[in-house]
Amino acid sequence: MKRQLLAFPVALMSLSASLAFAGGAPANQAPASYPVADSYLGEKLYPNEEAIAQGMASVIEATIRKQYQAGNARRDAHPKAHGCVKAEFKVDDKLADRFAKGVFIPGKTYPAWIRFSNGNPDPNKPDIEGNERGMSIKLLDVPGEKILESERQDTTQDFIMMSNPAFFLKDPSNAVAFFTALGSDSALAKAKIPFILGAHETATLLKINTKKISNPMQTRYWSPVPYQLGVGPNRMAIKFSARSCSTAQDPLPDHPGPNFLREAMVNTLKKGDVCMEFLIQPRTSDKLDVEDALDEWEESDAPFYKVATIRIPQQVFDTPEQQKFCENLSYTPWHALPEHKPLGGINRLRKVVYERISAVRHEMNQAERKEP
């Protein structure tokens, strides 16, 4: 178990503006306000939650500054990209009225950038090692004022997913202790991680950390944490998911190279377009917990509904220029319209962490931070 713990993924939570997850606001910018809990949708702030978020951001920032030299700072979570691809996100022509909110305008098509990634904090880990995988969608040309204070007028909307339907941290209560241990050079500190997490969270993390895939574009992804759909009295809590339009699966190669998942994407997109479906899962009962990120909403209790089709056209994406562009992109669930506000304690932490870490990364790399 100790060997596995050393390879634990720093999951989505570890980033704050892109956190794809670091402590205050960027220079020349006022500190962002901490999210207000929506009790109508089941949210509830944890004791000292904002201080936890700032502490977590500081721990992760220190790890980034220790791990990377200026000019080469990577994301703290999902630092290895299998590729960033151009895509189209087409909302279905016919949608139930209760789903036709925010970006889900029937028949609307958005250009998009999609980043497929590996969750291990070590960007040099070979792809064959089991791990969490990520799919982050950035829709472009999305009008309307956004939630994130520093980017209110930007025209993007992000959807962030991972290859497991449940997150490995239940709530903010043990986040600082976990990331402190994870960022430590001490094997003893890392050995304490199972005790910090508890049995259920450790089991979930080990499940995430041992999963292997053969092609990122044939893998299913979920938002393990919930989001709002709509505003006003008819707003609801949802989760979302993306999956291939086809059930075909590539076999794992007999002798995989260290970057075979990128190679699988290259080969797939040489042959033609890729189709994926985007689905939403409305919360159907108060028993489906908004604050517990370990709580998988079973499809038997809360079915998924398809709302859009993602088309990734045939393309060449593995160029140095596109890889640099991909590295400079920031993804955060708070790049969002109010109709898609992130919900739950883990998402609230991410607002602080993603914002700080993205700013730190771009500052260390002397790269301008802006949305495409």
Language model features with spans:
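Active-site-adjacent core segments of small-molecule enzymes
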Residues: 23-372
